[in-house]
Amino acid sequence: MAGQIFDAAANQSAVWAVILGAVLATAGGFVATQMERYVEHHRRERNAALFFGELLTTLQIILYHAHNAHDRGDPFGPITLRMLKSARKEIDIYDRNRETLFDLRHGDLRARIQNLIIRIAMPIEGVFDATDEIQRCQDQLRDAVAIPRPDLEERVESLRQQRASGYEFIMETVEALPKIIGDLEPLAHQSFRKLGEIGRNI
């Protein structure tokens, strides 16, 4: 009788050991999976912060040089327009990688980046459109040199004002870049200040 009781107790202990082992294995697997997800999420967030930090720093450098060119000679001469086209290319890179933005966990930061890009992209397109339209109007004025065209002259002046306003809006928007870049630095575990300084001194 005592042996039977002992065997039953031993069997019960074995069952509990199996159950405990299964629970620990499940818990261990769950913890390992969660840790893996945590590490992967932070890796992706760091890569995203590096990407957007470098992209926005490059955009800042390009627009810095565009502003310098704008203040010398023809405000919207070939150099200024070339710089603005380079800025547009950086925005195109952003557009192609926009889904990476969701790897940043801070919704406010994501919104600020997206809003800033839109506020720069739209007036840049406006500058290009106005420049092309001004050129067309000036070509028409040259072709009709013997015939006064006050309507075209007024159109050219209006387009120039629109272009100047769009450019000023771009430069005002750019002032928000340093703060956004600074907020990306802790996530990227890297400072972008040196890159910006080198770019401005080129």
Give a label for each model feature:
Residues 35-60:
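Juxtamembrane membrane-water interface segments immediately C-terminal to a transmembrane helix
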Residues 1-40:
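Membrane-embedded hydrophobic alpha-helical segments
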Residues 53-54, 58-202:
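Interfacial alpha-helical end/capping and short helix-turn segments at domain and membrane boundaries
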